[in-house]
């Protein structure tokens, strides 16, 4: 029995999809425990590139059962568009299962999201506008709509009418928008009920039974540690807990059943949207990482902000999640760049901080303290063992490992599933 949690260690886009794709073929279940269609990931299988948003990367596994857990917020229109797109390319999504307790994104959530961001102007957080935050707000406010609700029309109608009593007041009186008609939202959800019904299960029961039977479960967290609503760069965060603890809550698998926690981290750092970013680059190297690394958001098409590796964040992520292992990705992007700076600490108002500053105000003012290491010029995309890497690449990896708080067990040297060096197998941990 193995229960492995995959967590992004930075601000997302670290390569979680690749890690899930590799491990997904070795497990019986792949679970997405949080998030929605606001964070995409790219998976390359058999030379084919798949861009997934709501579905877990495990949907591309030929054997694993993919599950959307209770912590996910689901846009049904986006869900079925993604399923249809995969099946049109020959992929089989028929094994997908969905927790009855997952919450649903209503059209009015998307409207509220976009209107609020527009109203905030320069103070906007930079959301994707897909209604994720407002859906989580309704969940916490106990006025949300869950998957199970669309199979009972009277409950569904009651919940929607109750929610719109308040939301229409806000839309009309505060934002000068038209009121939303409740019946249109009711019919929107009912139109998906028949197709959705065969997919819905008691996911918590299913997963715990599987673990009792000695089966293997992989939990694929969305977003990343630094976007966690509690542990991230608040308020420039998502509305859920994409950390290891959140994976337990969003799946119904208890923390004592977790056998490994795998942090996914790039050999440099990226971020999408607003918020502090101490190692961000504004010169030719930022453009270089953006271009060579293909740093454009899968979900939004926005260019990602790029910067050097930040070991302060790596140590923080390791501590918050209790990482047993790290999966280092995109090492190949750093080939041939001369010298590679590594952020080892921050300076805040003249004081050195080796760990994450306690306050967001200090983090906003943090200046990186760098040490540099020489880069390598050799092509490493064909390396399959650590010893095949150039010595300078080996030295860089080992230095990052020393600084980051957990052992490096996987190294990505290209986008393909096979372009991975395995130092330690978490399935055997």
From Swiss-Prot:
Binding site for IMP: 13-16, 38-41, 128, 142, 223, 238, 302
Location of the active site: 13, 41
Binding residues for substrate: 298-304
Binding-site positions, GTP: 12-18, 40-42, 304, 330-332, 412-414
Cofactor comment text: Binds 1 Mg(2+) ion per subunit.
Record field: catalytic activity: IMP + L-aspartate + GTP = N(6)-(1,2-dicarboxyethyl)-AMP + GDP + phosphate + 2 H(+)
Pathway stated in the Swiss-Prot or TrEMBL entry: Purine metabolism; AMP biosynthesis via de novo pathway; AMP from IMP: step 1/2
Full protein name: Adenylosuccinate synthetase
Recorded name of the encoding gene: purA
